[in-house]
Each structure stands twice: as C-alpha cells, then as structure tokens.
A protein has these predicted regions:
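Terminal intrinsically disordered/low-complexity segments used for targeting and assembly
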Residues: 2-76, 230-275, 442-462
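Periplasmic alpha-helical coiled-coil/stalk elements that build and connect Gram-negative outer-membrane
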Residues: 21, 138, 154-275, 373, ...
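A small-residue-enriched
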Residues: 21-44, 75-134, 237-246, 273-340, ...
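Amphipathic alpha-helical coiled-coil scaffold segments and their short linker/junction regions
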Residues: 63, 73-80, 144, 151, ...
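Amphipathic alpha-helical coiled-coil segments and their boundaries
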Residues: 70-73, 80, 87, 131, ...
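Soluble, cytosolic/nucleoplasmic coiled-coil alpha-helices used as oligomeric scaffolds and tethers
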Residues: 97, 104, 111, 155, ...
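Short segments within alpha-helical structural elements
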Residues: 192, 221-248, 355, 359-363, ...
C-alpha cells in the first residue's frame, strides 16, 4: 500500500501548486499605459471603481468646461470613452488563457457498483486517473499563451493609438466644418446686402430683371450651401461627441472655430520609413504571432502520437477485501497520428511569416505615401493662403470698382464673387486635408497603421 500513498502525495502536491495560480484581470495594463503615454503623450486609466475614477471624472469635466484643443479632445476621449474600457478587458481574457495554459487537467474519479442478480454482496470498483503527461506539455502550452498575451498587449496599445488618431481626425473635421459654416454665414450676409442694393436699383430701373434675378439666384445658392454646412457641422459634432464619450450637459463643449494655420517649421519627415518600421506595433504583434505559431507547431508535433498519458490507481472489492493496483492509459496512434494538427500549425506559421513581410512592405509604402500626401496638402494650403486668396481679393476689389463705374455688368461682378467664395472654400478644405494627413502621418510614426492602410494586428484569425 506504500505506492498508492506516495501517488496520493504527489497528486496532493500538484493540486496545491495549481491552486496557487490566480488571474489578474488588469495584468499587462501598466505596460500598455506606459507605451501609450510614451507614444502619444496622453494618459489612459482603466476604471476600477476607486477614488482614482472620481479624479478622472473631475479632470474630464474640467477639460470639457474650457475651450477644447485637439490634444485635450484626445485626452478626454482616452479617459472617458467606454469602448476603450471594453478593449482593455482583452488583457484579462489573454491573461486568463495564460493562467489556464499552466493548469493541470483535473483527475478523473470513477465509481462503479454492481449488484449480483443472484443476490449477495455488491461489487465495488474505484478508479482515479490523472494525465501526468500534462507536466511535460504545460511549458509548451504556456509559451504559446505567453506569446499571445504579448500580442494582445500590443494589439490593445495599437487600438488605443488608433482611437486617439480617429478622435483627432474627428476634431479637425469638426473644426473645419465650424470654419466652413462661418464662411458660409459671411457669404450669405454679404449676398443679402448685395441683393438689397440690387433691389433698390431694380426698383429705380437701373438694372434689368435678368441681372436682379441673377443676384437673387446667387443668394439662394448661398443659403443652400449654408444649410448643407449646418448639417455637416451637426453630424461632425455628434461624431466627436461619440469619441469623447459625452452626453447630457457634457455635449456643450466648445472649440476654436478656425483651423490652426500650417505650422512652422513643418513636421519632420526624414527617415520616416525607418521610424515607422522601428516603432510599428503591427510588426511587433506579428512577430509575437510568428512566435506563437512556432510554439504551436512544436506543441502539435510533441503531442502528435501521444497526446494523453493517464496514470492512476484502481481499487476493487468483490468477494473478499479490497484489491488495489496501478492503471496506465494511453491512446494507440493507429489512425490519428496528429497529421492534421501538425499540418495546420505549419500552415499557420507560414502564413504568419508571409503576413509579416507583407506588412513591412505596406508600412514602408504607407510612410512614403503619407509623407507625400502631407507635403502636397501643406503646399496646397500655403498656395491658397499666400497667392490665390490675396489675388482673388484684389480681383474682387477691382471688379467692384469697375462695376461701380458702370464699366462692367452684374454678370462679371457675380462671377468674381463666386470665384472668391470658391477659393475661400477650397482653402479651408486644403487646410483640413493638411491636418488630417498630418494626423495620419503622426499615427504611423507612433506605431500604428492608419485606418484603411491594410491588415493590422489582430485582424487575422488564429
């Protein structure tokens, strides 16, 4: 009876060691937080129902009470958006998988009682079996789960940075819509004054019905453009509200109604490809996916022939006293020799490797494309600001003088006004495009491919 006692002692020790494993649902968040702060200069907090949450709420209210800048809007969104809080829970899921990978499977305890049909004493059989091969396979499973946990941390970090970039884009789009609305309001006011003057001239017989109708048509077109600008502003405000996690009185925030001018000096673009590759969370995540796929292949090969090996004890009582003996259980690999599992793991490893190389090419191409796009948008905005806008203003002033001197007709005057309006609209659009391109370029250099640039960490099923 000595060996069953020793076996029982080993089982008890394993049960004790397994019971020591625990799950920290916030595991890995400190690393994510540090990486986000280093890459974006913004802070994130995982709500825990503590005093820290109240401090965060107070900070959010304080920021929303003032006039928001783009940086402040991003900070509010990172602190206040509930979707981000849900994303952080992915860390707890991955940590739970890592803990689970380090646990032994529970022993199987079986009891069988048979009653002789002729009467007499019942037969009793007790069996306890445990898969001790788990002791060999646990390190392999843990390495796979650890790589996936690292990938999850990178994916969550990338999701936070992407969300910050989306919030910044929403801010600039809304700010451009504010400026566009202000422009359209100014245009309608000016056109209304022009129509009123034209009305008096028409009543006095100094301009024809056709010229007066053209003035009115231009005003009505301006009013229609104003309504479109109001609708666009309402939509962009709600987009920003969603990003900020704002509702109720919190939606009464204000921002500057004009886009900032093109910054001087411009954003540094030297070695952008190198920086994008070195900082890429997408590539780092794919490296972890390759590591996990390699570990999974090793695990599949190791368990191909003998995935289970049960060792246990059996006690049986029939007519006499209990008889006790060992049990050894293992599958005989006659049909399933793990070919499918090994082949799948090898294919997933090859896929992960090829995706990594494809992503590296995509990141380099995106860096060049965004650099050129940002430079083109900047040149376009500066060209409108420094050349076309002053030129259109000069043309409008000269046209007005010629019209007042009755040297040209109302058609030429209206055409000059339309050109001036369209140039101003184009300038706002060019300035908006510059800030959007700058946001995407900065996001790439912080380590995340902008939305629409291709497959990112976590998009491919494992």
């Amino acid at each position: 009876m000595a060996w069953p006692l020793k076996l029982g002692g080993v089982v008890a020790l394993l049960i004790y060691l397994s019971g020591c494993a625990s799950v920290r649902l916030d595991a890995g968040f400190d690393e994510v937080k540090a990486s986000v702060e280093e890459r974006s200069k913004a802070q994130i907090v995982w709500n825990s129902g503590s005093d820290l949450d109240r401090q965060v709420d107070e900070r959010v209210r304080s920021l929303l009470a003032g006039k928001l800048t783009a940086d402040q809007a991003v900070q509010v969104a990172l602190l206040n958006n509930r979707q981000l809080q849900a994303i952080y829970s992915e860390l707890g899921v991955a940590q739970s998988d890592l803990v689970q990978a380090g646990l032994l499977r529970n022993p199987i305890f079986d009891v069988a009682v048979t009653f002789p049909t002729s009467g007499g004493r019942a037969d009793l059989e007790l069996t306890a079996v445990m898969n001790f091969l788990d002791l060999v396979y646990i390190p392999l499973r843990k390495r796979v789960a650890a790589s996936r946990f690292e990938e999850t941390k990178l994916r969550v970090t990338g999701a936070v940075l992407a969300f910050a970039g989306q919030t910044r884009r929403a801010f600039y789009i809304h700010q451009a819509n504010e400026q566009m609305l202000e422009l359209r309001q100014t245009v309608v006011q000016a056109l209304s004054a022009s129509v009123e003057v034209a009305r008096r001239l028409h009543e006095a017989g100094n301009i024809s019905d056709l010229d007066f109708a053209r003035q009115r048509a231009l005003l009505e077109s301006g009013k229609l453009a104003l309504r479109s600008a109001e609708a666009a502003l309402s939509q962009s405000r709600e987009q920003l509200n969603m990003a900020l996690g704002a509702w109720g009185k919190a939606t009464e925030w204000q921002i500057d109604r004009r886009l900032p001018d093109v910054p001087v000096p411009p954003m540094e673009t030297e070695a952008s490809e190198k920086v994008a590759i070195e900082k890429s969370l997408d590539l780092d995540g794919m490296k972890q996916r390759i590591i996990a796929a390699g570990e999974q292949l090793g695990f599949a090969k190791a368990t191909a022939l003998v995935p289970d090996w049960g060792i246990g004890t059996r006690g049986e009582r029939q007519e006499g006293p209990f008889s006790v003996g060992p049990i050894l259980e293992f599958p005989i690999p006659l049909f399933d020799q793990g070919q499918g599992r090994s082949g799948r793991a090898a294919a997933e490893l090859r896929r992960a490797q090829q995706e990594y190389y494809a992503a590296a090419v995509r990141i380099r191409s995106t860096a060049r494309s965004l650099r050129d796009r940002m430079q083109a948008a900047q040149d376009r905005a500066l060209y409108y600001r420094d050349i076309l806008l002053p030129l259109q203003e000069q043309i409008m002033n000269e046209t007005q003088l010629h019209y007042n001197a009755m040297q040209i007709g109302v058609v030429e005057l209206l055409r000059a006004k339309e050109q001036q309006i369209e140039t101003a609209v184009a300038y706002v659009e060019a300035l908006r495009d510059h800030w959007l391109a700058r946001t995407d370029f900065a996001l790439l250099l912080s380590g995340r491919l902008p939305e629409g640039s291709g497959v990112q960490v976590g998009q491919t099923e494992k």
